[in-house]
Amino acid sequence: MPVLASPASIGETGIDAQKLHEPPYNLIGRKIAIGQVEIGRPGQFGIDKSVSWNPAIALERVFFRDGPAKVNTDVDSHAGMVAGVMISGDKTLPGVAPGARLYSSASGSPVEGGQPEECLSAQHVALQNGGDVRAINFSFGEPLQRDPRPEATLDGNALLTQCIDWSARTHDVLYVIAGNQGGGGIPIPTDNFNGINVAYTTQRDGVFSKVDFANLSALPVGIGRRLITREINVGPRRSINLSAPGSKIAVYELDGKIVEVSGTSFAAPHVTASVALLQEFGNRQLQSKQPNWTTDSRRNQVMRAVLLNSADKIKDNGDGLRLGMTRTVLGKDNLNWLESDAYKDPKIPLDIQMGTGHLNAFRAYEQFSPGQWSPEAAVPSVGWDYRTVEAKASQDYVLEQPLKAGSFVSLTLAWERVVDLDDKNKNNAFDVGESFRDRGLNNLDLYLVPADDNGTTKSVCSSVSEVDSIEHVFCPVPTAGRYKIRVQYRQQVNEASQPYALAWWTVPAQ
């Protein structure tokens, strides 16, 4: 029997979610709805004969596309394993959010359907729980060679990719997508703009901290270049946003045997279920009417900014200058974040292999819990906001405390591409046969500037990608003093008013 690795992936050697399960936090995702879409679905004990034992996976509901699940049909051990990572209530192999409500839809065999049916499944899951589903897990995808477009590329405009970006905005749900890996083959919808694409890590010295070799997220070189070039995003926009544990994860087979599995399929659900933990906390704050807390805490882009901004990059020495980060994350080439082009080039917000770093659910809680702060008054050293910025204008967040020299600042700005549904029958829903229209992405930039500066000429650090739906700053403060964060609406492509989420983490110079 293999060593039980799942607790390692949700404990402090992994995403450190187990700490949140226990007092004083007591967060397990209670009453929070999350979703799952893949080819098959988890089995439901008492309904499906193939589930011969009662796994501790309490599914809320299972579906076939946009209808009820067929008994003993589409039951798939892969889907069951992914569900287990999210919601297993088993004592031996607990999931990340054992209290969450999971809605799972099987889109069926690719032979009988394709992207339209997968879109239908995603829409159906997004509408469950009275339309209140906070995150949906995609641990599968569509190969480019099956895409009906001539000369199909990863440009964000495959039907399924457009569907995900449309649904993210329409249903306000965070899509978490397993990154492309190995020989490639499942790149659609990893070219989405509005979700989180996840690479997977393996353990190094007992800690999940190294991007594994099977991830396809390296810059293409050598003999495989032609194939791989088609399998990474067109242009400079990067696909991977975040990394999470995915190597040798212990899960249950349908018959109750424990097996070890690897891949981005098992990294993504760590992220999806972490949303449920944060959202249970958010609900608690709303119910007790806490100050600096609104329903904006439920927004998908707020979750995206919070998860990406709180990721681990470089282990803190104990002096807090690196924001208390718990591990140094390495790429396949053994380079860390400070050696990456993303660190050196303001036009590149994401490392091509690890995105902003490694998922840390406990740090995400520390990022989220200080609450929402508006630019109208000075803001605390850690927090987040959801607001709009007008074309050619900017929003300034003045940090209340002066920052410590040599300390790092982490800032993440997230916003969405606009995709419209070409709704032929005017029923406000996607139907097979309908299509979407890409209305593009507005260009926003992010700066850290001295508090008394009016322009961005003196910016200390910036993130100014022309193509990404995310800007991310991780940089050291050169001199102690007061600073402000500037969100700049650089260039209009669709609407003049752009909603955004912003998360920040700084070190005050006490």
Sequence positions of predicted segments:
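Extracellular S/T/G-rich loop segment that most often corresponds to the catalytic His/Ser-adjacent loop
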Residues: 188-280
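Secreted peptidase-domain scaffold signal
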Residues: 324-442, 501-510
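Subtilisin-like serine protease catalytic core
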Residues: 4-12, 17-117, 130-135, 145-148, ...
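A cross-family glycoside hydrolase active-site/sugar-binding cleft signature
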Residues: 105-106, 137-141, 176-180, 199, ...
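Gly/Ser-rich catalytic serine loop of serine hydrolases
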Residues: 69-83, 156, 257-273
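Hydrolase catalytic cores
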Residues: 107, 244-337
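C-terminal edge strands of extracellular/lumenal beta-sandwich accessory domains
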Residues: 299, 304, 309, 397-399, ...
